[in-house]
Amino acid sequence: MFSSLLEAAKSSPFHGPLTPARCDAPAQGMAASAAPVGDSCEFGSTKYFALCGLGGILSCGITHTAVVPLDLVKCRLQVDADKYKNVVNGFRVSVREEGLRGLAKGWAPTFIGYSLQGLCKFGLYEVFKVQYNNMLDEETAYTYRTFVYLAASASAEFFADIALSPLEAAKVRIQTMPGVRQHTARRVAQDGPERGAWARSTRALVPLWGRQIPYTMMKFACFEKTVELLYKHVVPKPRAECSKGEQLVVTFAAGYIAGVFCAIVSHPADTVVSKLNQDKTATVGSIVGKLGFAGVWKGLGPRIIMIGTLTALQWFIYDAVKVWLRMPRPPPAEMPESMRKRLEAEGKL
């Protein structure tokens, strides 16, 4: 894996002129198929999906934990704008009151919660994408591929947020409420669904869906389409001729572009979730009414930086894990030959 990262750091396919490039022809159908020589598993097999889940654990758990200090300041900006004026001021006040160690508050529930979320988000996305594609014929699957990405990612995130919600609530309380300690997350996990701490922590599940499902739909659909467009219009050679490192650079670039859009579409719901987890008596309506239109966008700047970087790194790590484990990595979608011939005969291509 680390050799892949080093190779990517030294590679960049964007040095040439802007010329169209051919994409590799996709495999016919999305069902599990025999593993080509060199691959560690069959595409669409149980092992393939399990390894995708492992990649999700690493990509989400590591990256979200790495940006805990920025996330802490972002949450405090959202819940106490009078005290924390901006990002720089938020860091200064936090360090002055709690020291540098205070910037790591909430790291444990962040790591556990987002690792579980990553397992479901990436693993189930691959499962649902294959299943939904198999429900369609080849031409329909290609024509409506963006809708397949949207449906698969929304389905995966629905389950991922059920795993994340209790630990996300614990994280926000640790970061924004004085006196709340790290063991809050452990207590939530030990209580289980039937106990009060768990029930209170899941009250923000619906707003969390409101934040994360649009975020994830944008994250996956925008990434898939951006990769497709980069190889078609920007990268000066076909994907098959790119080294693994160059392919990972394209992955990182597409991930960052997707991350910017993710942050924008999900930010109002993110603000509401932070407020709900801070104040157990608040409702979605009361929070939106109190904050107003401008208030729900508070903290968007640092969140764009955080989510853009996070999303790029997550896709990079996820793809690097696939390279490291020698997993099948299908190329971007290309028009089926039957569809191409039909459109050419009709003079539409």
Curated annotation (Swiss-Prot):
Coiled coil: none annotated. Solcar repeats lie at residues 47-131, 144-229, 246-324. InterPro entries: Mitochondrial_sb/sol_carrier, Mt_carrier_dom_sf, SLC25A3/Pic2/Mir1-like. It is found in: Mitochondrion inner membrane. It holds the Pfam family Mito_carr. GO terms for biological process: mitochondrial phosphate ion transmembrane transport. Its main location: mitochondrion. Keywords: Membrane, Mitochondrion, Mitochondrion inner membrane, Repeat, Transit peptide, Transmembrane, Transmembrane helix, Transport. The chain crosses the membrane at residues 48-68, 108-128, 147-167, 207-227, 248-268, 304-324. The keyword Mitochondrion applies. GO terms for cellular component: mitochondrial inner membrane. It is a multi-pass membrane protein. GO terms for molecular function: phosphate transmembrane transporter activity. SUPFAM superfamilies: Mitochondrial carrier. The keyword Nucleotide-binding does not apply. Belongs to the mitochondrial carrier (TC 2.A.29) family. Transport of phosphate groups from the cytosol to the mitochondrial matrix. This is Phosphate carrier protein, mitochondrial. It comes from Choristoneura fumiferana (Spruce budworm moth).
